[in-house]
Amino acid sequence: MSTQPIITRFVLTEKAIRLAEKENTLTIVVPRSVNKKVIKDYVEKAYKVKVIDVRTLITMEGEKKAYVRLSSENNAIELLTNLGLL
């Protein structure tokens, strides 16, 4: 795994906040060349959380968006708040 940060930005739309609250899921934008395994490893190491699942999609704008579901031991809203994003 590269030591470079792979998260381009966090998505903080109404839908993303709702997913964080109800499904404990972070929504992030990553480079298109990054795969699910790399995303999972990076999020676990960088934020010291346990990742259960990673789902990805390519948006109509050509960005790769990843939905990263955290274990119940970790709280997505709390993580976003600690990062100063909420």
Curated annotation (Swiss-Prot):
Q: Which HAMAP family match?
A: Ribosomal_uL23_A
Subunit record text: Part of the 50S ribosomal subunit. Contacts protein L29.
Instruction: Tell me which UniProt keywords the record has, alphabetically.
Output: Ribonucleoprotein, Ribosomal protein, RNA-binding, rRNA-binding
Please give one Gene Ontology molecular function term for this protein.
structural constituent of ribosome
Q: Does the keyword Hydrolase apply?
A: no
State which gene encodes it: rpl23
Q: Give any single GO term for biological process.
A: translation
User: What PANTHER family does the entry give?
Assistant: 60S RIBOSOMAL PROTEIN L23A
Q: What does this protein do?
A: Binds to 23S rRNA. One of the proteins that surrounds the polypeptide exit tunnel on the outside of the ribosome.
- What SUPFAM superfamilies has UniProt attached to this entry? Ribosomal proteins S24e, L23 and L15e
Q: Please provide, in alphabetical order, the Gene Ontology terms of the cellular component aspect for this entry.
A: ribonucleoprotein complex; ribosome
Designated name of the protein:
Large ribosomal subunit protein uL23
What family is reported? Belongs to the universal ribosomal protein uL23 family.
